[in-house]
């Protein structure tokens, strides 16, 4: 099967890759007439042309379009609460997220809290609401991604920053998997090279982290196939998308790859790279951070023989005769797309931050236990420190 076939069979939601503009207008007609709330980035919606698409679809369906664009690159609790209040006040027939992962995550969280009646803070955690109300039927967001990275259009996750505690918090909730996602690759053409690089690396990390997560293989029979297809598409097309933003074939492939990556982590989750970089928001682009951390985490995983075998399955994509050579080949790919070689070259990542990262990461028992090679809690700070220091110094050449 190819990427469109995998995506068409995505469980639990509709992801439209063919005639998405018509599908959006039809969805508004089905739900309307009424109000449509569009959550967007501050400038990206105009730059990519997406806001015009929404206006046209709403007009064709006889719906009033209400736009909210005051969403930070790292959305904070107060912003999501404002979005939640807007949903409650306007009672829309549809909520649309047009943007990158930050916009989609914020909209998913706001839509959930607006309907649950719970304070937003009570949703942080895993299936907090759906475990209490398994029969609830909630309206879900329509997602239109304008980047090719997070795969939030296909996940049950929402990451929100709590400035008071200086941490990014996670909602993992099956009720926020988007009801409908529309993939319109043309909307990603306006991404500058740096954003293309960072988001593409995030998608690549999702696919590889999920593929290496051998303990979660039973969660969905096709997840590893999705991961391999995502990795293949990214290794072939990310360099082209960075070099030429209007390369339509490369942008199409990257859109598919990002969504496949989201589908992968929905069932197999991320690992230590995401854990270790969770508090680095505002200091280093998320996709760059997880990609840089992956080689050192991957080497730790090799202590699990099943990960050794899984690693060698990637040798057609990252050539090597041993697991170490495969990892080195992956790092060479990162070099080829301009990812820094070492954290010491990243001004925002200080030694003090790395020490705090090891201490805080050592408290995340669930993430440590579910890593492809579980991290013993008693040794977690030492192991995370070693991974972080290796990434700080960079791979030996």
Question: What are the residue ranges of the model-derived segments?
Answer:
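ATP/NTP phosphate-donor binding region
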Residues: 1-94, 343
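Glycine/threonine-rich beta-strand-loop-alpha-helix active-site module
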Residues: 78-185
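C-terminal charged capping/lid subdomain of soluble metabolic enzymes
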Residues: 315-397
């Amino acid at each position: 099967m190819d990427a469109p076939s995998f995506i068409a069979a995505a469980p639990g939601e509709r992801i439209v890759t063919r005639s998405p503009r018509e599908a959006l207008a039809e969805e508004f007609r089905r739900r309307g007439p009424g109000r449509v709330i569009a959550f967007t980035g501050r400038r990206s919606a105009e730059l990519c042309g997406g806001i015009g698409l929404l206006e046209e679809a709403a007009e064709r369906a006889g719906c009033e379009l209400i736009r909210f664009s005051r969403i930070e690159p790292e959305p904070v609790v107060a912003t999501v609460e404002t979005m939640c209040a807007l949903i409650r006040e306007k009672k829309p027939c549809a909520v649309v997220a047009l943007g990158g992962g930050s916009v989609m995550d914020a909209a998913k969280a706001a839509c959930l809290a607006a309907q649950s009646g719970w304070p937003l803070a009570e949703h942080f955690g895993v299936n907090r609401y759906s475990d209490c109300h398994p029969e609830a039927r909630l309206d879900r967001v329509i997602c239109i991604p304008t980047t090719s990275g997070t795969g939030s259009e296909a996940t049950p996750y929402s990451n929100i920053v709590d400035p008071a505690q200086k941490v990014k918090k996670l909602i993992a909730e099956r009720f926020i998997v988007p009801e409908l996602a529309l993939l319109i690759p043309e909307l990603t053409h306006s991404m500058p090279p740096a954003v293309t690089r960072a988001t593409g690396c995030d998608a690549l990390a999702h696919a590889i982290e999920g593929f290496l997560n051998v303990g979660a293989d039973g969660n969905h029979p096709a997840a590893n196939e999705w991961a391999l297809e995502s990795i293949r598409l990214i290794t072939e097309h990310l360099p082209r998308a960075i070099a030429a933003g209007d390369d339509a074939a490369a942008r199409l492939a990257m859109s598919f790859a990002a969504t496949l990556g989201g589908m992968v982590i929905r069932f197999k989750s991320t690992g230590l790279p995401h854990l270790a970089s969770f508090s680095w928001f505002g200091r280093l682009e998320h996709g760059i951070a997880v990609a840089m951390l992956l080689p050192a985490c991957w080497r730790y995983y090799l202590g699990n023989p099943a990960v050794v075998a899984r690693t060698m399955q990637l040798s057609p994509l990252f050539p090597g005769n041993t697991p170490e050579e495969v990892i080195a080949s992956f790092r060479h790919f990162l070099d080829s797309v301009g990812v820094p070689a070492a954290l010491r070259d990243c001004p925002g990542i200080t030694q003090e931050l790395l020490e705090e990262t090891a201490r805080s990461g050592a408290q995340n028992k669930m993430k440590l236990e579910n890593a492809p090679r579980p991290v013993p809690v008693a040794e977690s700070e030492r192991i995370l420190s070693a991974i972080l220091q290796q990434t700080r110094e960079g791979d030996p050449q």
